[in-house]
Structures are given as C-alpha cells and as structure tokens.
C-alpha cells in the first residue's frame, strides 16, 4: 500500500484541507472476507477526477469530513476508514464510473439495517462534488449477516404452514384500494378466496381511514377467511396491513391479528422504516405470523439510473430486516422491471448463495449463510394471458397477484378468481409435462378455456391489453455485452447439432 494512503500516528497534526484521494483511494487494497463491499455509480461534477470522487464517497460514508481534524490522532483511521479500491468507467455513459468501496465491519451496529443505511447512504448523496450518485449493489459478509434474524419464517416454513406445494401461490389486491366499507371489503375477500385464490391483500395505503377503520376490516376479513376455508378445505389468508403511524400502534394491530388466528399480516417497509419493520419481523417470528412486505415508495429511490439506490440493494436490506414476501415487479405487467435485472434480485431474495453476474446486475457474490429466503410477489397490471410467462419467469416459489385481473372479470370476483386458478393449474400441468410455456402458452390457455367458461371470458376481455413501454433502469452496455457473449457461447456448446 502506498505511503500516502496510510494515517501515520507519528506525524503531528496539520490543519487544513487535502484531497480525499490521498487518504481514501487505495487501489492496492485487498478486500477482506469481513468487509462490506459497495458498488457506487458515480457522476462527478466537471473537473473532479473519478479517483477523487470515489475517494470522497468512501470518506463521507465512513470516517472522513471536509477538513483534517485534531481528533483523527486519537483513533486509527486505517482500521476504520472506508477505502475506494477500484474504479471502472461505465461504457456508453458520459462521465459515469463504478466506484468500489470497502468498509470495515466494525463501522456498523450488529443487526441494524437502519445503521447500515445511515452510514453508507445517509449523507454522501448530497455531496456537492457529485452530480449524481447511485448505490448499485452491496456485498454483505457472512459475519454481518449472522447478526440478523432475517425473514420471520421463510419459503419452506410458509409452504408447510399453508400445505401448498408444487406451484406458485395466487393472490389478489382488493380494489378499489380506498373507499369500500369494511363489510363490502370483507365480501370481496370472501368471493376471491372462495373462487380459488390462496391470498387476498390490503393495498399499501389501506391503514385506518374514516371510511374503514382497521379493527372493522380485520374482523370482516377474518370472517371471510374462515368461511372460505370451511367451504374449500384449503388454508387461506389475507394480508392485513398493520402499518401505522407509530410502532406501538403497529404492534397493537399485529397482536389483534394474532388473536384472530389469521396466518399473515403486512407492512409497508420503506414508508414504515427499517426499525419498525425489523421489530415487526421479530414479533411475527415469535408469534407464528407470516409477514408480507409491500415496497411502496421504492421507485422514488430506485427508478433513476444515475441516482438513488438500486432495488437489488433494497431487496437485500429487506431479507436482513425481515419479510416472507416482497413485491418484485412482474417483467410483463404495468410496473418497471427489466427481465434480467428482475431475475437477478429474485435470486438474491430466494437463494442461499448467488454468484457474481454482471449480466444480471449482480456486482458481488452473496452468501446468505442459511438466512431464510423471501418469496417474490409479481403484482401490477397482470392478467390471465400473462400466466404462462409469469410461471416460467418466477417459478414455483413466488406469489402471482392479480388485482384488476381478478376483480375486473365480467362475471364478478369469484369467477375472476376461478379463471386465474384454472389458468395457473393449466400452466403448471403443461410445464410438468415438458411443454414450452414461452412458445405454447397461449394455446395452453385456449385449451383450458374450452372447459372453463370463466377462463374463456377472462381471455376475451384482456386479449389485447399490453404494457409495451421500455424500462428506465436497464443494464449497462458492458454488462449486456457480457450477457450476449454468454448466449453466443451457449449456442456454440448446446445449440442445434442436427
């Protein structure tokens, strides 16, 4: 390591300002297994060298400030400082760089996503020397991961609780999201569950408003759950949104849900905050409740390509903080989400170990050391014609959630639920028989529609509904090139040998 990167205790204090790169840019640094690693997309102001910009990020998100201070001599900056250890130019983007920063583990409180984010993204995003800054990815080391409980239960425990295997789970968000009375709301829940869905859901902004107070909603939804269970012989659930203005009120609602005996509750983890979410996840683990997570407000943070926090980071944070489900986009619906990027963070939610794969936006390998997985929830502008693609993209360990695609059925809520259940069962059966859902999906649905009038009616209503808009957040050209090279190699190895 070059001498200028080291803090020498023997050197007397010299007041003044010096370049960040003299202390915080360390290209010879070898990362440790215990380091938290971050990949930042940095857009410096004109005239600011990329090394200085990367070093400024490392400094301002760890031990540094704008000037030298006397108290630097009272500690070991070499032990505690963040280090920018690599910078690479983003091909195809003007003045954008990926700056890699390593943080010593001792900088962070154990088991606290709140402290992790306060340090890494808390202040540096307003730094004047940067035009824009985005946190693209984090590597959470096993030593830090082990300080978190993570999801209350995880995928396998949820399947065992529900006694549902071998297929994605089906859900529906009750619409209109605001304005229904508690009794009419409960009626819609019952009709959807009775028609064949596994779950129904409160929308993210359903809390406790004048038209429907939370306690009334909980009671009528519990009645709908028990009635539909008795009639179908299946375990059912409704995501009762416990999000509230205070943690005390949130936990009071969770307690009431537990007393009703329902299987699952819900939280808006970004608007509610990581501290509240972690507290609720601990309560759910201790009291046998599943926890559904909505990501309301995420696009404010993650949608712009050059500034903010990528959703893969927010997904990792949720797995640490705790949740059994989280909304992940659909690829095919009305909400933002490129296929390869979405599949990348879906793997980060579910798998125990994920390899580095820049073609899917994954900058670092991630070892979750047996932390339970989280089910991705595909929701937003989807209907029966999307079922083959959703089944292929997300696989069995997912929740496919049709709001308007259930409640918008021309014959009513229950027939809408029937249509979705029949479509899912047909796609799963076809997949298990070895059929190609991508190529034969429409034919599979048409065949199933011949013996299900509910599905046939749904197919007719939504046959021309598409959301053909290009995503804003896409892979960089150099990452796409890696994907293209991998596809070319695969064609050479496994292509048609006829």
UniProtKB/Swiss-Prot annotation:
In its keyword annotation, does this UniProt entry include Disulfide bond? yes
Assigned EC number: 4.1.1.39
Residue positions of the PTM N6,N6,N6-trimethyllysine?
A: 14
Q: Which residues form the propeptide?
A: 1-2
Residue numbers of N6-carboxylysine PTMs:
201
Q: Where is this site: Transition state stabilizer?
A: 334
Q: Which Gene Ontology biological process is one annotated for this entry? A: photorespiration
Name a Pfam family for this protein: RuBisCO_large
Reaction(s) catalysed (UniProt annotation): 2 (2R)-3-phosphoglycerate + 2 H(+) = D-ribulose 1,5-bisphosphate + CO2 + H2O; D-ribulose 1,5-bisphosphate + O2 = 2-phosphoglycolate + (2R)-3-phosphoglycerate + 2 H(+)
Active-site residues, as the UniProt record annotates them:
175 (proton acceptor), 294 (proton acceptor)
List where in the cell it is found.
Plastid
Region feature (Disordered): 471-498
What InterPro entries does the database record attribute to this sequence?
RuBisCO, RuBisCo_large_chain_AS, RuBisCO_lsu_C, RuBisCO_lsu_C_sf, RuBisCO_lsu_fd_N, RuBisCO_lsu_N_sf, RuBisCO_lsuI
Positions that bind Mg(2+): 201, 203-204
The terms under GO molecular function for this entry are: magnesium ion binding; monooxygenase activity; ribulose-bisphosphate carboxylase activity
PTM (free text): The disulfide bond which can form in the large chain dimeric partners within the hexadecamer appears to be associated with oxidative stress and protein turnover.
**Mind listing the UniProt keywords for this protein, alphabetically?**
Acetylation, Calvin cycle, Carbon dioxide fixation, Disulfide bond, Lyase, Magnesium, Metal-binding, Methylation, Monooxygenase, Oxidoreductase, Photorespiration, Plastid
Co-factor binding details: Binds 1 Mg(2+) ion per subunit.
Name the needed cofactors: Mg(2+)
Top EC class per UniProt? lyase
Residues annotated as binding substrate are: 123, 173, 177, 295, 327, 379
**What else does UniProt say about it?**
The basic functional RuBisCO is composed of a large chain homodimer in a 'head-to-tail' conformation. In form I RuBisCO this homodimer is arranged in a barrel-like tetramer with the small subunits forming a tetrameric 'cap' on each end of the 'barrel'.
- Function according to Swiss-Prot or TrEMBL: RuBisCO catalyzes two reactions: the carboxylation of D-ribulose 1,5-bisphosphate, the primary event in carbon dioxide fixation, as well as the oxidative fragmentation of the pentose substrate in the photorespiration process. Both reactions occur simultaneously and in competition at the same active site.
User: How is the subunit organization of this protein annotated in UniProt?
Assistant: Heterohexadecamer of 8 large chains and 8 small chains; disulfide-linked. The disulfide link is formed within the large subunit homodimers.
Report what the protein is called.
Answer: Ribulose bisphosphate carboxylase large chain
Name the source organism.
Cuscuta reflexa
Its gene?
A: rbcL
């Amino acid at each position: 390591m070059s001498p200028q990167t080291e803090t020498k205790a023997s050197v007397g204090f010299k007041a003044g300002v010096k370049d960040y790169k003299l202390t915080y840019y360390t290209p010879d640094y070898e990362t440790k297994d215990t380091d938290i690693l971050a990949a930042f997309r940095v857009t410096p102001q004109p005239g600011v060298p990329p090394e200085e910009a990367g070093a400024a990020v490392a400094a301002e998100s760890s031990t540094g400030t704008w000037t030298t201070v006397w108290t630097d001599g009272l500690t070991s900056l070499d032990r505690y400082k963040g280090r920018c250890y690599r910078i690479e130019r983003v091909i195809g983007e003007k003045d954008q760089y990926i700056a890699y920063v390593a943080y010593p583990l001792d900088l962070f409180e154990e088991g606290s996503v709140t402290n992790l984010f306060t340090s890494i993204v808390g202040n540096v995003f307003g730094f004047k020397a940067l035009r824009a800054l985005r946190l693209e990815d984090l590597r959470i080391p096993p030593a830090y991961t082990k300080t978190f409980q993570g999801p209350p239960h995880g995928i396998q425990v949820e399947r065992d609780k529900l006694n549902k295997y071998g297929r994605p789970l089906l859900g529906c968000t009750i619409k209109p999201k605001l304005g229904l009375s508690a009794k009419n709301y409960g009626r819609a829940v019952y009709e959807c569950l009775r028609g064949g869905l596994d779950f129904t859901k409160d929308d993210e902004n359903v809390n406790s408003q004048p038209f429907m107070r939370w306690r009334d909603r909980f009671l009528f939804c519990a009645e709908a759950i028990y009635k539909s269970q008795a009639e179908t012989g299946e375990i059912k659930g409704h995501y009762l949104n416990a999000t509230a203005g205070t943690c005390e009120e949130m936990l009071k609602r969770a307690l009431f849900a537990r007393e009703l005996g329902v299987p699952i509750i819900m939280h808006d983890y970004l608007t509610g905050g990581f501290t509240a979410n972690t507290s609720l996840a601990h309560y759910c683990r201790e009291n046998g409740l599943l926890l559904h997570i909505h990501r309301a407000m995420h696009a404010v943070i993650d949608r712009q390509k050059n500034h903010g926090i990528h959703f893969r980071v927010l997904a990792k944070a949720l797995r640490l903080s705790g949740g059994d489900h989280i909304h992940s986009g659909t690829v095919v619906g009305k909400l933002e989400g490129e296929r390869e990027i979405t599949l990348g963070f879906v793997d980060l939610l579910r798998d125990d170990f994920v390899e580095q794969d820049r073609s899917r936006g994954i900058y670092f390998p991630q070892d979750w050391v047996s932390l339970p997985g989280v089910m991705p929830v595909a929701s937003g502008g989807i209907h029966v014609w999307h079922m083959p693609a959703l089944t292929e993209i997300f696989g069995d360990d997912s929740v496919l959630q049709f709001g308007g695609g259930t409640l918008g059925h021309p014959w009513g809520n229950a027939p809408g639920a029937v249509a979705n259940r029949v479509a899912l069962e047909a796609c799963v059966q076809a997949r298990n028989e070895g059929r190609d859902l991508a190529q034969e999906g429409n034919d599979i649905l048409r065949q199933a529609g011949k013996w299900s009038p509910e599905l046939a009616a749904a197919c007719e209503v939504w046959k021309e509904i598409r959301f053909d808009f290009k995503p804003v957040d896409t892979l960089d050209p150099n990452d796409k090139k890696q994907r293209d090279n991998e596809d070319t190699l695969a064609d050479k190895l496994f292509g048609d040998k006829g």
